[in-house]
Amino acid sequence: MAPKRKSGVSKCETKCTKACPRPAPVPKLLIKGGMEVLDLVTGPDSVTEIEAFLNPRMGQPPTPESLTEGGQYYGWSRGINLATSDTEDSPENNTLPTWSMAKLQLPMLNEDLTCDTLQMWEAVSVKTEVVGSGSLLDVHGFNKPTDTVNTKVISTPVEGSQYHVFAVGGEPLDLQGLVTDARTKYKEEGVVTIKTITKKDMVNKDQVLNPISKAKLDKDGMYPVEIWHPDPAKNENTRYFGNYTGGTTTPPVLQFTNTLTTVLLDENGVGPLCKGEGLYLSCVDIMGRRVTRNYDVHHWRGLPRYFKITLRKRWVKNPYPMASLISSLFNNMLPQVQGQPMEGENTQVEEVRVYDGTEPVPGDPDMTRYVDRFGKTKTVFPGN
């Protein structure tokens, strides 16, 4: 007799007698840019687009405008002066390309700052491109000729090292200082150097990453590109993009289109939040160098950059309690004074007494009592 086939149902299997309980839903907390993000703001006026441009700051300021008194160098640097030795390198300010930056003041969203939630502008995307690359086709100017023997040649076009960076954020761009040679003597006026920030001469650590050599891009045309670089350890509320191509005779390579959109959202779907209704734009676009025909002087060439930023409104939790706002208001009303030290290592405070309630008359009125860091009352017994 053939054996019987066992049932396919396992005897060890247990069935749920009732539905499994579901975890209770809780609000998801997301922190970005120092604000607690809540939700988007919907509506017909919840999205805004802003178009702006930044002009290059290659060393020559916008003024004077006269084309015979320095205005002809606007968009260029002045002639680069070389070091005379390893220890004698002092570049002129007008030969140093610097960062371009601007702050756009956005429409105010909150009339009542006492609410638990506030509206903020959030940068969602940007369309950007360098403007004027066709001007680099000029080969009939008074530049160094491509052949010094044959006279029927063209002028050498702009070529060499190229550097392109742009940034969009709700706060100024954070910068990290780093130089090629810490012995370089930059001018102390007209530009912001590492010495300007640290109040000390540069050291060997400034040739690598020195944690104290940091700054914020708060001035246009003041931060040299060869000194200050985007800080990857910061810039939580800023998005920056860039590339560098080196070489002495590298031809410029540039793509441009009005169809490319760069998304500014992070992995959590949140873009830079504009604190105080301020949007910050920064950029550097160095196309290379030209060499003049008569003196073989090199000039950096920069081009402007166009921005089209899309912003939307977002609800955030109010990070500023009313108590702190009122306290800050009263503190700012008081005059700022500079007196003798009453805090720190050189404090001149002798003794502080705090009374709370009543107690029996102590037999030793000079005994020392204090509250330690754990909140416990301590009594110091007199020594011999």
UniProtKB/Swiss-Prot annotation:
Molecular function in Gene Ontology: structural molecule activity
UniProt KW keywords: Capsid protein, Caveolin-mediated endocytosis of virus by host, Disulfide bond, Host nucleus, Host-virus interaction, Late protein, Phosphoprotein, T=7 icosahedral capsid protein, Viral attachment to host cell, Viral penetration into host cytoplasm, Virion, Virus endocytosis by host, Virus entry into host cell
Source species: Murine polyomavirus (strain A3)
Other facts: The virus attaches to the surface of cells by recognition of oligosaccharides terminating in alpha(2,3)-linked sialic acid.
Function: Forms an icosahedral capsid with a T=7 symmetry and a 40 nm diameter. The capsid is composed of 72 pentamers linked to each other by disulfide bonds and associated with VP2 or VP3 proteins. Interacts with terminal alpha(2,3)-linked sialic acids on the cell surface to provide virion attachment to target cell. This attachment induces virion internalization predominantly through caveolin-mediated endocytosis. Once attached, the virion is internalized by caveolin-mediated endocytosis and traffics to the endoplasmic reticulum.
Residue numbers spanned by region C-terminal arm: 322-384
GO biological process terms held by the UniProt record: caveolin-mediated endocytosis of virus by host cell; virion attachment to host cell
GO cellular component: host cell nucleus; T=7 icosahedral viral capsid
Modified residues (Phosphothreonine): T358
Family: Belongs to the polyomaviruses coat protein VP1 family.
Record's keyword annotation contains ATP-binding: no
Compartments reported by the entry: Virion; Host nucleus
Protein name in the entry: Major capsid protein VP1
Gene3D superfamilies: Capsid protein VP1,Polyomavirus
Domain statement: A DNA-binding domain overlapping a bipartite nuclear localization signal is present in the N-terminal region of the protein and is required for efficient virus formation.
Assembly information from the UniProt record: Homomultimer; disulfide-linked. The virus capsid is composed of 72 icosahedral units, each one composed of five disulfide-linked copies of VP1. Interacts with minor capsid proteins VP2 and VP3.
InterPro entries reported for this sequence: Capsid_VP1_Polyomavir, dsDNA_vir_gr_I_capsid, Polyomavir_VP1_sf
Short motif Bipartite nuclear localization signal, span: 4-18
Residues in coiled coil: none
